[in-house]
Amino acid sequence: MTAEGDNRVLMIKVVKDMLSIYMKNPEFVYGGEFIKIADKNELFCLKTVSVIFQMIEKFKLDRLINKMTTLKGNGASNYDILMFETSDEIQELALAHGEKLAILHCIDSLEKLSASKEVMRNYFLLFAWEVLLRELSLMLLEGWICPKLAGELREHYNALIKKAAKDIDVVIDSLNIPVHALQVPAAKDYIKYNSYPNYGEVVGAKL
């Protein structure tokens, strides 16, 4: 978190580093063929879904570079391009990059698990589907998912939440989060928070 209380201002730093690395090494991002999720089994496969994450990152990187190039050609200054003209694209790309790293780490971690593998797979899949739901319009427009599966994704997501909910206490315990930290309001109005019984954003979350 920054002094302004918004970690999104750091995203420009992430993207500037990404652009610098990409210009020297284009293989830094996904360079394979773009796929299409057309089968339910592919939707439930984390490795297949991770390719979509990489495609989203590549799409948003290309979109940003193209817009920056056009603006630069029209005489816009580097400052105006970064701070005003491409602010939304920069934030979206930084988020996509972080989510790609997260899903790849999830897959790597899953391969090292045994007893808790199925439990954690459900939670990793929930994370992945939440991202896909947010990016569903892009995926449909680009032909990365068939319309039928796109229409069923929310139903699969809700069903998996119900399935995973029974393990939530075990999962929280496995993260070794101190009990007192579960009761701390992470980002709420403290005056309002203390005006009524509120047992923490984690414990009290309505999932």
Regions found by a protein language model. Name each.
Residues 1-207:
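Flavin-dependent oxidoreductase catalytic core characteristic
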